[in-house]
Amino acid sequence: TLKELVGKNIKVLSSDPTDAGAEGQIWYNSTDGVFKTVLNVGAWSSGGNLNTARATGAGAGTQTSALAFGAYGGPEAVLTEEYNGSGWSTGGTLNTGRGYLAGAGTQTAGLAIGGRTPPSTTTDATEEYNGSSWTAGGALGTGRRNLGGTGTQTAGLAFGGNGPTDATEEYNGSAWTAGGALGTAKQFLAGAGTQTSAIAFGGQVPSTSASEEYDGSSWTAGGIMNTTRQELAGAGIQTSALAFGGYSTANTTATEEYDGSNWTNSGTLATARRGLSGAGTTSAGLAFTGYTTSNSAATEE
């Protein structure tokens, strides 16, 4: 037995631990009736800084081919930057400068959705990126800011937003149509996945730890995050999602991974921040920009 070999008992737990300290530990899950362990917990490392610090923008793409665009106020509101896995370079400028928007798609087929233009105007504008320039797309049915977004340029999804609202809209590459309403109206939330298999998590209801899953027509309750927060970022897909950063009672470094039913704590960000953007997957995520005590240009992989 393990006790005979190393002089220690194996803990018996009714549920799996959700903290990063579980890495390397062995326990017996009495509910599942099996021994379990965590061999590895994800970790963040520094990437190349953006050329312009910003917060409340949006992102799209992958860890090695990402897009950062928008911000609230200042010249950075129209700026786009492209990431190649090590550094950022200047891309085409948005036609409508804005922050508190949502993003979707890829570096060469991006989608900028809604947002807030100074001084305090909510916009329904959608723009499409082709790898070098932005052009106008179909307007949202309901103009909003502080919303979540995911999917692709030709199959996008927008959900939640100021109010807060429970409204969901689906994009086909030219026009938005109404989708199924969120179970709970919320804003400052994050999302991941596709138009027909998405997850929305966190946000302000007030601040929540809840997640919801979308099947292309309706939302159902998903797993509960370990850290309640808003103004966070997300990446991945519905069955393998990543939630990171945001604001709880203060800016947080917390990172969590979702397996389709449960959230588990993972390696923390080096820099606590809210209003950040994300891209990539659970195993190759990208966190960039945000607000610490000032706008940030930091990137983490």
Please provide the spans of the model-predicted regions.
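Polar, enzyme-active/binding microenvironments
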Residues: 1-301
